């Protein structure tokens, strides 16, 4: 399970940043080969990742993460699912905010090197390394959006090292 600890930490941090409003619950689902393992360390890594941006890395550890997240009034649910997925192992972190807003992020390890990847955000398939700085943009799929975004970032000397695009259907949300 150790290769998944960093991925889980990053999924927790991403889920916190993507959530809107006050989060009431976090659901962590494990798919594929992970259902055969004790996933408590992975759940704690998600919680630690969630909290690290709030209380700092020094204020949270694997032991106190479940207690601290409860102190924030957040209910945590874990599920192991035998449902078929596109990956041998997959982890999904879903949040529900007090206003009913729901967000989800899925991650897996790819290849022999066990490279961590975010493979889905809010139902949109992507493939991106969960590095320290990510920009997630939701827009209507139409010509010129990517170019305008690239120009705007370039005007502020922001270098785009990697990009992942996804859409449900032409002209829909991307």
Describe the residue ranges of each PLM region:
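A conserved regulatory-domain signal marking ACT and ACT-like small-molecule sensing domains
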Residues: 1-174
């Amino acid at each position: 399970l150790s290769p998944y600890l960093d991925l889980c930490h990053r999924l927790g941090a991403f889920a916190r940043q993507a959530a809107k409003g006050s989060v009431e619950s976090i659901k962590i689902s494990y798919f594929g080969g992970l259902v055969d393992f004790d996933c408590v360390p992975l759940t704690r890594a998600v919680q630690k990742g969630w909290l690290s941006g709030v209380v700092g890395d020094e204020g949270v550890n694997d032991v106190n993460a479940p207690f601290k997240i409860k102190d924030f009034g957040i209910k945590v649910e874990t599920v192991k699912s035998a449902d078929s997925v596109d990956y041998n192992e997959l982890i999904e972190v879903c949040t529900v905010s007090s206003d009913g807003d729901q967000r989800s992020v899925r991650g897996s390890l790819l290849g022999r090197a066990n490279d961590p990847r975010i493979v889905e955000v809010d139902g949109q398939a992507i493939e991106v390394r969960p590095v320290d700085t990510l920009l997630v943009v939701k827009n209507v799929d139409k010509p010129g959006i990517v170019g305008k975004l690239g120009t705007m970032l370039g005007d502020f000397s922001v270098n785009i090292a990697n990009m992942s695009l996804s859409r449900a259907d032409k002209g829909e949300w991307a």
